[in-house]
Curated annotation (Swiss-Prot):
This is Cation-transporting ATPase 5. Coiled coil: none annotated. Plays a role in regulating calcium and manganese homeostasis responsible for cell cycle progression. It comes from Schizosaccharomyces pombe (strain 972 / ATCC 24843). PROSITE patterns: ATPASE_E1_E2. The gene is cta5. Mg(2+) binds at residues 838, 842. GO terms for molecular function: ATP binding; ATP hydrolysis activity; ATPase-coupled monoatomic cation transmembrane transporter activity; metal ion binding; P-type transmembrane transporter activity.
Amino acid sequence: MDSIELKQLVPENDSEPGTPRQLLFQHYDISNEETIGIKPFKSIPAKVYILRVTEILTLGLLHLILTWLPEFRLKWIEAPCSNEDVEFVAISDPSGTSSIEKVSSICLKNDIQTSSFVLPSGKTRYFEYKKLRFYLEPLNLQWVLMPLETSAYSLVTSTPAYIQNGLDTFTIAKLRQVYGSNSLVSTKKSIVTILLNEVLHPFYLFQAVSVLIWLCDSFVFYSCCIVFISSYSIFLSVKESKESENRIHSIIGAPQPVTVIRNQVKQTVLADDLVIGDLLYFSNLDLKTCPVDGILFSSSCLLDESMVTGESVPARKFPLEDNSLDSWMIASCNIFSPHLIHAGTKFLKIDSTPSTPCLISVVRTGFRSNKGQLIRNLLYPNLRPSQLYLDSMSFLKTMAILSFVSIVFIAIYLNLYNASFGHVVLRSLDVLTILVPPALPATLSVGIANSIARLSRALIYTTSPESIHNAGCLSTFVFDKTGTLTENSVQLSCVYVKSGSNGLLKQVDADSLSLDSTKLNAHAYRVATCSQSLELVGNELVGDPLEVTLFTQFNGTFCATIRASNTPHPPLFSVSNSFDGPSQIFSIYKALEFDPVLRRMSVICSTSTERSLMLFTKGAPESILAISSQQSIPSNVQEVIHTLSSKGFRIIAFASKNLITPLQELIHLSRSTLESNVTFQGLFVLESPLRESSKDVISSLLRSKMEVSICSGDSLFTSVFVAKHCGALDSCNFIYTAELADSGDDCPQIHFEKIDLQTQNFQPIPDGFSLKDVILEKDSSLCMDGKLLQRLLTMLSFNEIKILLSKLRVLARMSPFDKATYVELCQKYGCKVGFCGDGANDCIALKQADVGVSLSDSEACAAASFVSKKKSIKDVFNVLLEGRCSLILSHRCFQYMVLCAIVQFSGVFFLYLKNYNFNDNQFLFMDLLIIFPLSAAMSYFDPAQNLTSNRPNSTLFGKGRVKDLGIQSVLIWLSHGLLTLILHELNWVELPEWQLEKSNTKNVLVTSIFLLSSLQYLGICIGINQSSEFLSPIWKKKTYVCLCTTIGLCNIYLCFANENHIISRCLQITRLPTLYRFIILFMGVISCCLTSILNM
């Protein structure tokens, strides 16, 4: 549910004219994952007029800047106010992103009554934010989203004969005005709009200004090349944006016709015309996608919910029979509700008859539906800038400050020599374009782009490119167990049933079930075949893999169900088994779906001969034992469960109960009443084999000093067994298992067991042993269930929880929300966390993690950072390697671009002192034939083959990097200064005199600094790109080696080439003394050596 928190802010100067007495800041929770802050503002007319005049005088430049920085527009022309006078609202989210939305008005023809407030007829103010409309509630002056679920409930309960009549035309028109339609249409941007958005980006505008400066300085050819490269880059960006937009619209799809009951008749309308409270009519002829979130009112149906929940197993939905508000809210707000049908889910089967059609009441439409939320996430992704990007922007600001200091110095210096004003401006701006490389942030994404390409070729797709850098600095990785570390397939190992003589459990192997059914009692067959989730779609059996295994192992058969029109509660489906024979048919009347909290599922059925009702239930042993009568529980059950769990088996307990209450009354009884005082019957023992690659991946992560944890919904000892056999516990000698003992005290009683991993034996626990003893003991790890973890979080101190997290290796009985909570907890304590799951119950944790690797490709798993099409756990290894590779390449590209800018700035600085400059072809040679190819080749290094214990630094300013950059910058300046000094002191040649209006571009000093700079560009590249444990060996990258060799030979050739050679004439290289040429070459080699030493 949405929630609101209001904060009253008192202005500092309450007597200031025009200042309201109270300022209202509103904190609003749109959902559990989306929170915004809303602050109202109003315009100051005089300041608005001044700003518009200024925007005109600056030819729109100021308007463009304020478009990039909307918060500055607010500060200049808007004043904070109360919601009574609001004209604009400033929206902020926890990531720091802000936006300004205009407040509009709508004229309501009638009052709109909701459960918590009333929107009166007349003028009502609202604003739209990311496809959601917020209304100003007039009584408390609060911004609110319309409460769809409660409003839909009011419509259903207040409409006379709702099931027969549906909504009337008047109500539909009133609802559409306020709640909006069911449209998910997002206006497609034209190519021109996308192009303008790209061109008006600060990066390309800076490029455009730079090109104008270069053209004024007669660098025509160089400018044309930059324009061509930038145009191609813009083309690629526009193409990518358009393709992304088309992908989103393909998910939305075209509006489909649906049947709806309105004004007492069935009508066919487009799905876009639906409103909350509408009554949809579906039949088996309408096996299509549901366009809204709705509550099922009659009949039952089988759905493919993979798009919304990520669950690959089809889900059966049942009608909501309890019409209370509490039941309605639980059904409509719980994503796993058995009565809720999500928008975007596909009907596989509808069990409807003319007397009981499939009727669905609409509770959420448009972007408020679950599919709408998915589309909103795609349209407005939560783009948190990486630390690397933020660091590069900070460094750009530093470079900008340095450039302005240099501009002032150059301007003063040139004025001393009576240079013209135009020449001073041109040289000053030229310094700015050299020292502040606008492509610096873009170079950080080159390594990411190459990593994405390599991952795509390996069938690993990313939905969050910025997460690749996060993958390079993970410290903790969490794995789901079932379907991730183990195979999806489940095999029945054996069955334990009660012995007739003494009531103890006895074992029956799975191989003998089909040979001699008398070894088992009838309940094992009946529970196994009377399944809750199985369906026969066509000729294919679909459902939970565990139930499919039990059904087929016990020779279950689906039977045709005869639905009598006069039967008030027809069966959902019917089955038979080999024990009772084909003549004994079991009809399932009610299915209590698997509940992750209760950890069990049940069915109510009857036989075709006795017609007596029975309840069969199965689930986690502790869950079934908790509802079983004490006299039915064998005395050796705990011993058997403990032994089997320690061997890694998955245990499902089952029980039964004879029901004497009539069916029409049973249907309305609560689950807790039905599932009570059952008779315990036995245990199904199953096993899921480990994936072949699980142990290799886990071992590699542990060798790289990464913390590895396993989260599972299975029992504690089963999870520990899997963790041990996949190598997750190899780094410790002992493990402690901790379980919460039943106790009514506020302080929980914890039962510990100590296991020696070398001998596989249980060790004695001393008296008075506590959790703090485990925390303090070295070489040990801790395993516990989710229930105990939640209790401990409320009891332990900050430091104790931190140590606890470092020792936790296995977490059992974890619900989907428990997994996400554990990931969030690790992040809270400073860990970068990765999570790998199969998508079924892991969507929340996958989204919460810094890096989520999904082994499912359903649409719901778009929340994961990476999706494996091969569904292989080895892809975790590939993602981590690519993350480290892209991170180190981004560091190197950043360092290279910065040092190249300093080399070029240092060179032109010493040339400007004589009013000299590089010529057009020299700039072109340095930038496009040396810097650009080398920076591109640098970014194409492949990742290393193995993970190492070291991790690359996530920040650009760590481990003395700034100090190294500073030292290298000083060395560059000293080398250029020394070269200039040598030329002056030796007096080998006479330099041209100062020219007032034009810089000299052909003389010995220009040639010398050009040759030295060219050598330094190559030397810096070689010095930076040394062997790294995160990258493949340099010699394997033949393109890079060949390019460096070619550029090096070209530079040596230029040092000694005759000035009359065609290349020398093209680059305007003048004649140099031979010794001086050797000095230049020597200084270039020394620069390379010093750079290499500093980067070791």
